Amino acid sequence: MGFYQGPDNRKITGGLKGKHRDKRKYEIGNPSTLTTLSAEDIRIKDRTLGGNFKVRLKYTTTANVLDPATNTAKKVKILEVLETPANKELARRGIIIRGAKIRTEAGLAVVTSRPGQDGVINAVLLKNESQGS
């Protein structure tokens, strides 16, 4: 079932507006993809406008982590989600979003990609905290 993202039929005062047209297909949205840690990677392939596809990462175990000191990237295992600046409740539930601080086998890192939109987790190691847990 889709999520309607068009204008609602309420005025500021709370009264109903007159309906002047039907809902359009382009006003349909999708629920958030709450990427969490799991034993395996699961991706969802959604069709979007124009016949394009969006790959959503539902469950994951690894992240592509860039080490800025050596300018090398490697695929490492994610151990836990430490904090999320957008919402502390997301960190408590273990949901990975852009800007979340995660602990990996390579050390602490900040997620730079949008897992629900890109289908992959890219992260950058934090300076002075590259030691593992």
UniProtKB/Swiss-Prot annotation:
Keywords: Ribonucleoprotein, Ribosomal protein. It comes from the Archaea. This is Small ribosomal subunit protein eS8. InterPro entries: Ribosomal_eS8, Ribosomal_eS8_CS, Ribosomal_protein_eS8_arc, Ribosomal_Se8/biogenesis_NSA2. Part of the 30S ribosomal subunit. Residues 1-22 are annotated as: Disordered. Pfam families: Ribosomal_S8e (PF01201). One of its GO terms (molecular function) is structural constituent of ribosome. Belongs to the eukaryotic ribosomal protein eS8 family.
